Amino acid sequence: MNKEELLKKYEATSNEKAKDVFFSPGRINVIGEHTDYNGGHVFPAPISLGVYGVYGPRDDKKVRLYSGNVDGDIVEFDIDDTNVEKDEDRFWANYFKGMITYLREKYDGIDHGFNLYIEANLPSGSGLSSSAAIEMLMGIILKDEFNLDVDRVSLAKMGQRTENEFIGLNSGIMDQFACIMGKKNSAIFLDCNTLKYEYLPLALGDYEIIIMATNNPHTLADSAYNNRVAECGRALKKLQQKLDIKALGELDNDTFDEYSYLINDETEIKRARHAVSENQRTLRATQAMKDGDLEKLGRLINASHESLHYDYEVTGKELDTLAEASWKQPGVLGARMIGGGFGGSAIAIVKKSEAENFKKNVGKIYRDAVGYDASFYDAEIVDGTKRI
């Protein structure tokens, strides 16, 4: 997206010059799905699809948000206003309001409002973490404008708090961490229990990652996402009768199998089994990445999707169609759904020489199966949220 064009759009909506332009990336997750809130490991990376913000300070306390993706969509509120926006047309402002609220709780000096023109090139409802991108965009803008002594990990935690407490979605920290801590051409191997992390180059050689958007938007807060969190929580509590653990991510597969009888509920056993096995797959996958064993990485990615389908039950027809069609194509190492599920997106690791045929073939299979088109994007891995 052209910076000069963004500046012109800001001036057209605010009748003044902008101060700065910022970009906050969306993210993919190579493997480690629904493990972050279970104290497990994840392996995400920020992508070139994301959210742009053109910023200008005001001399009053008004915050004026203008969305370039919905023509004329403007939300205004006072910087002291900490009320959750209930109106569906204004709900997107909550991601900004939550960050403003929690930063002002901890840091003095955020004493004036601002104008912000926002435009995203993320596919709508794609599950590529536009909400976390917005939260981290707001965090970095406020840190920059008011010279706040806040580190990026703390901003990621505030973004998670915005989701959990302000929005009401019981998500983990992976999305915010990936958006703000990203490093070009690398994925982040993150322990969500300790927040220890390691950058691993996404060295795929003759292969690339292709993002496949179902174009069936997911709405996590209105879906079964919170139910999955609760089911895992109940399973953990039952396991704690015999095991000294704080999270499902502390278990290996054998220990879980030995003590799963304590759960005594088939659905909760399935949910917990995914959380445990997916964490183990993530550990093995990152080791395969270090070893340069891309075929093993691909097999683990496929197994991740199967677990998300059978044990976690968050895939659905669209995501299953994309994954299963991908598995049948030449030059594909692995494919799986990413994000919360219930729509959204999938990824595939595809040989570069087969990429165009892959998109054509999978696209046709998908359209024939569901009745509308999927969208395909090459995943370019970029730095985390920053001024541009």
Swiss-Prot record:
Write out the residues that bind substrate. E33, H34, T35, D36, Y225
Coiled-coil region(s) at which residues?
none
Citing just one GO molecular function, the answer is: magnesium ion binding
Q: Which domain of life is it from?
A: Bacteria
Q: Which UniProt keywords apply?
A: ATP-binding, Carbohydrate metabolism, Cytoplasm, Galactose metabolism, Kinase, Magnesium, Metal-binding, Nucleotide-binding, Transferase
Q: Is Disulfide bond there in the keyword field? A: no
Which Enzyme Commission number(s) are listed?
2.7.1.6
What the entry lists under Pfam families is as follows: GalKase_gal_bdg, GHMP_kinases_C, GHMP_kinases_N
Top class in the EC scheme: transferase
> What is catalyzed by this enzyme?
alpha-D-galactose + ATP = alpha-D-galactose 1-phosphate + ADP + H(+)
Q: Where does the protein principally reside? A: cytoplasm
A Gene Ontology biological process in which this protein takes part is: galactose metabolic process
What family is this? Answer: Belongs to the GHMP kinase family. GalK subfamily.
Known role? Catalyzes the transfer of the gamma-phosphate of ATP to D-galactose to form alpha-D-galactose-1-phosphate (Gal-1-P).
Q: Report the protein name in the record.
A: Galactokinase
Organism of this sequence = Lactobacillus helveticus (Lactobacillus suntoryeus)
**Gene name on record?**
galK
